[in-house]
A protein has these predicted regions:
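A cross-kingdom marker for long, charged
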Residues: 48, 234-319
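Short, positively charged and aromatic/hydrophobic N-terminal segments
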Residues: 5-6, 10-12
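Bacterial N-terminal signal peptides that target proteins for export
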Residues: 15-25, 35
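Sec-exported extracytoplasmic/periplasmic mature domains
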Residues: 70-78, 169-173, 284, 288
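Acidic/His-rich structured neighborhood in mature extracellular/periplasmic domains
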Residues: 104-216
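Flexible, glycine-rich surface segments
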Residues: 179-268, 272
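Start-of-domain marker
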Residues: 41-107, 118-120
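Sec/Tat signal peptide C-region and signal peptidase I cleavage site
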Residues: 34-40
Length: 319
């Protein structure tokens, strides 16, 4: 009996040690996983290089370029913010090649889009959607894409970095008032340091919708109401609608008054127009169940901000 008791105690002790070892191993694995998630890169970018306009060229250079851009955007840590893998910003970079020469010169359009999830909804809302028609650069197959914030000597990586910073900064602004300032300052820095490379899109007095104009306009103090709009519209408005649709819609209506203020304070700004183009269908849907008073007020503001879409804004009244 003593032997049996000793054996039982020994066996119990062994099971306890194995259990403790299992728990310790599990904790270490979880800590490692959480640490890995906390330092995940910010972007989950889908990249497409469309070369359908280019005939009689070895297609491998376009495939290699697509892979290189994807790795450049998704493997780099662009900010000091902590992102879990599930928090990555879903975005797309569609590079349309208009011209290509064998010496590696590309003339392209770049369509950039980014979205963020709406709280408690199986729905993503578009935050940024822009077509850059002045993306020219040099790239030889298998070139490594490298980038330095302070020394800009490659237009392709400068453009990609600029939009990466812009996307992240805008996304942060939707979650906290002016939350993306530090990252948006990096986008401004890219613009300033790209002045000397002699490529289109960076100059202060170029196209009113070029890269310089876009970030300079956004960071102008006169456009602070626009940055507040991004927070109020998304965080107080859309994110609230799953829990209380009436309150969320009311907050969106209030936020759109900031859009009107932006238009009045800086009538030449392109940002209010871009916002209405991006949010057009979403706004029509949001107000499909709005009150008559809400519909009238929103229709008035939107027709003032972007009269070219009056036909669309009238759908708000018709719903």
């Amino acid at each position: 009996r003593s032997f049996i008791r000793i054996f039982a105690l020994s066996n119990s002790s062994m099971r306890m040690k194995m259990t403790i070892r299992y728990i310790v191993t599990l904790v270490i694995a979880l800590v490692g996983l959480l640490s890995q998630q906390a330092t995940a890169q910010e972007l989950e970018a889908k990249v497409v290089v469309n070369h359908s306009k280019i005939q009689g060229t070895n297609n491998s250079v376009f495939t290699t370029l697509q892979e290189a851009i994807t790795e450049f955007l998704n493997s780099r840590k662009w900010s000091n913010a902590q992102y879990a893998t599930r928090e990555k910003i879903v975005c797309s970079f569609n590079l349309i090649v208009n011209e290509y020469s064998d010496d590696g010169r590309f003339a392209c359009n770049l369509m950039v889009q980014a979205s963020r999830p709406v709280y408690n909804a199986s729905y993503n809302t578009t935050v940024f959607n822009f077509n850059d028609n002045a993306v020219d650069f040099n790239y030889i197959e298998h070139d490594k894409l490298e980038f330095s914030d302070e020394i800009i000597d490659n237009n392709l990586t400068a453009v990609l970095a600029y939009y990466a910073y812009l996307i992240i900064g805008l996304d942060m602004d939707t979650f906290a008032p002016k939350g993306g300032t530090d990252v948006l300052n990096k986008a401004e820095n890219v613009v300033n340091n790209a002045q000397m490379i002699g490529e289109d899109g960076w100059k202060a007095f170029g196209d009113s919708k070029n890269r310089h104009a876009l970030v300079n306009d956004y960071m102008n103090g006169a456009m602070d109401p626009y940055r507040q709009l991004l927070y109020d519209y998304h965080r107080k408005g859309l994110d609230e609608m799953a829990q209380n649709a009436e309150r969320g819609r009311s907050n969106i209506t209030t936020s759109l008054a900031l859009l009107e203020k932006c238009k009045q304070d800086k009538p030449m700004s392109v940002l209010p127009q871009l916002f209405t183009e991006i949010k057009k269908d979403e706004l029509i849907n949001v107000y499909s169940k709005g009150t008559s008073k809400e519909k009238e007020e929103v229709n008035r503001i939107l027709c003032l901000v972007n009269p070219s879409l009056t036909t669309d804004w009238d759908k708000i009244m018709d719903n």
